[in-house]
A protein has these predicted regions:
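Active-site catalytic motif of lipid deacylating hydrolases and related acyltransferases
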Residues: 1-56, 104-115
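Gly/Ala-rich beta-loop-alpha elbow adjacent to hydrolase catalytic centers
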Residues: 61-70
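Conserved alpha/beta-hydrolase catalytic His-Asp/Glu region
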Residues: 115-157
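Short beta-strand/loop motif that positions the catalytic acidic residue
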Residues: 169-171, 175
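Short glycine-rich catalytic loops that host catalytic nucleophiles or stabilize transition states
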Residues: 30-32, 187-192, 198
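Catalytic histidine-centered segment of alpha/beta-hydrolase-like enzymes
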Residues: 38-39, 192-207
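Flexible "cap/lid" loop of the alpha/beta hydrolase fold
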Residues: 78-113
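Active-site signature of alpha/beta-hydrolase-fold catalytic machinery across serine-
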Residues: 18, 72-73
């Protein structure tokens, strides 16, 4: 069974380096694409899904923003099973800060340059909300194109979808980005932060074995 995997905003496949995937799963990592100028979200999702063969069975795994993307792909090309990790099933899972950001539209006036690699304030914020106690957080945050980052943040804030109960959700109880109190996940990673694929790989590996094993 093929398993297509999409990482979180700004993160590459290395965030999954500690995960032991079920034997028999053929892993295919879908790397982030830089959005075209003023690209619509639906068009971007189509481009991210181009490597998927709709004529054969497959599963999807998405982390954080990747979890949102795989749900949108699933609407277009139904998967055998979809698991989202440290992500949300619907807008109700967003934090209060995200809701304030969406309503205020402040993100629209923030210049793209504010998200470049030399932006100390932005990357300090990333460290704080992902895992403030992990000094290696930026090791996994390698996709740093400023237009991609700003565009992605806008799409997360604007994302609107009806919850699909068939989606399997794994959440961490100390996640600041997508607080667990706003969701009703299938699995809870105790003591996990938004960086749980790295710090709680053993627990997540066991869940993936349970859900994907034997498919």
């Amino acid at each position: 069974m093929k398993l297509y995997i999409i990482s979180g905003l700004g993160a590459d496949r290395s965030v999954f380096e500690n995960i032991n995937f079920p034997s028999g799963m053929e892993l295919h990592f879908i790397d982030w694409l830089v959005p075209e100028q003023d690209e619509e979200f639906d068009h971007y999702v189509n481009r991210m899904a181009e490597s998927i063969n709709p004529d054969e069975d497959f599963c999807l795994l998405g982390y954080s923003f990747g979890g949102i993307i795989v749900q949108e792909i699933h609407k277009k090309i139904p998967a055998k099973k979809v698991i989202i990790l440290a992500s949300i099933k619907s807008p109700s899972g967003k934090s209060k800060l995200m809701e304030i950001g969406k309503r205020s539209k402040l993100y629209k006036i923030i210049p793209t340059s504010a998200f470049n690699e030399k932006s100390y304030s932005f990357y300090s914020f990333v460290r704080h909300i992902f895992d403030p106690k992990n000094p290696k957080i930026l090791k996994y945050f390698k996709v740093r194109n400023p237009y991609y980052i700003k565009w992605s943040i806008e799409k997360i804030l604007d994302w609107d979808a009806k919850e699909n109960p068939e989606i399997i959700q794994i959440s961490a109880d100390k996640d600041i980005v997508f607080p667990i109190k706003n969701s009703n996940p299938n699995y809870v990673i105790k003591g996990g932060t938004h960086l749980c694929p790295v710090t709680k790989a053993k627990e997540i590996s066991a869940i993936l074995e349970k859900e994907f094993g034997g498919l």
